[in-house]
């Protein structure tokens, strides 16, 4: 089935899957960068450069007003808090665990859509939440090191990203996608800089490896991925988008194994698998309903 602007459902799915792959690979990259920089210093650099790169192609006139302005500020706040808590959590927890916990945002998205927009995701959501909760327990059980502060920060990140999935779906159909992306990126840069001044004693060790990680994070995770997400989600429901995001922790775990040598125990893989199954159970019925629409 095609869309008014010529984008097919399959093209939209593949576009979002590419963004999901790139975001999945970023966990290991950022984990490596945090050996050379404090979290807020890294985020401030990453998103400030990304905002500058996006600015030339962004239309700032007419200036945003009303619902677009409120939506842009909301997106900026959600992404800022999400990335700050995710990056701070990565200092403490592993990239693989972080990716599986962040992926719970896909389970939370239908719940948030129900709470805020009255969009009923179906009875499987409760079962999916139960599976995800059990998955978190197995992933962070005492034998696996227990639930640490990094995991808790990452849970906050998952809630923010779940809300962002819903907000992008609602706002992306009405307003200029690139401008909304710039709101998210610039908002994260500003909030990170303010938090840096208040909460952190910044440290950056400049090296070739750090610059490569920064460049990868800026070009792919902070600009390309957001543009791909905004472009793709104009043509799908938040539930369908959340279903595609289910692949992110798998990409992240594979990259963390290849790049960082991280390995999960069998019980942790079982926990991660339950989280992914929970996401699929929560999102697939609504995604099928959207695909069978008029």
Regions found by a protein language model. Give the residues of each.
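Glycine-/small-residue-enriched transmembrane alpha-helix faces in small-molecule transporters
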Residues: 1-41, 77, 85, 143-170, ...
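Specific transmembrane alpha-helical segments of multi-pass solute transporters/efflux pumps
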Residues: 22, 26-27, 55-102, 109-110, ...
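Transmembrane alpha-helical segments that form core, pore/gating elements
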Residues: 28-29, 50-54, 109-110, 146-200, ...
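C-terminal transmembrane-helix exit sites in multi-pass transporters
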Residues: 53-62, 86, 105-127, 143, ...
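Hydrophobic transmembrane alpha-helices of multi-pass small-molecule transport proteins
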Residues: 54, 73-75, 79, 121-141, ...
């Amino acid at each position: 089935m095609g869309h008014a602007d010529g984008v097919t459902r399959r093209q939209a799915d593949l576009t979002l899957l590419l963004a999901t792959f790139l975001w999945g690979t970023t966990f290991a990259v950022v984990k490596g960068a945090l050996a050379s920089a404090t979290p807020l210093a890294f985020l401030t650099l990453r998103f400030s450069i990304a905002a500058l790169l996006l600015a030339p192609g962004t239309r700032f006139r007419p200036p945003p007003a009303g619902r677009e302005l409120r939506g842009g500020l909301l997106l900026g706040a959600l992404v800022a808090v999400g990335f700050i808590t995710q990056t701070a959590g990565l200092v403490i927890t592993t990239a693989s665990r972080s990716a599986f916990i962040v992926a719970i945002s896909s389970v939370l998205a239908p719940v948030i859509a129900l709470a805020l927009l009255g969009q009923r995701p179906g009875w499987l959501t409760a079962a999916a939440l139960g599976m995800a909760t059990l998955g978190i327990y197995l992933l962070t059980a005492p034998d696996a090191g227990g639930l640490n502060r990094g995991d808790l920060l990452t849970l906050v990140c998952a809630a923010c990203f779940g809300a962002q999935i819903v907000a992008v779906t609602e706002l992306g159909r009405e307003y200029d996608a690139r401008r909304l992306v710039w709101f998210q990126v610039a908002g994260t840069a500003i909030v990170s800089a303010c938090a840096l001044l208040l909460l952190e004693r910044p440290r950056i060790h400049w090296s070739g490896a750090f610059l490569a990680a920064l460049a990868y994070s800026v070009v792919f995770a902070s600009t390309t991925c957001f543009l791909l997400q905004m472009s793709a989600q104009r043509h799908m429901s938040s539930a369908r988008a959340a279903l595609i995001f289910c692949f992110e922790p798998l990409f992240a775990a594979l990259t963390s194994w290849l790049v960082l040598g991280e390995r999960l125990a069998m019980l942790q893989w079982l926990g991660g698998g339950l989280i992914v199954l929970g996401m699929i159970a929560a999102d697939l019925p609504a995604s099928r309903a959207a695909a069978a629409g008029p």
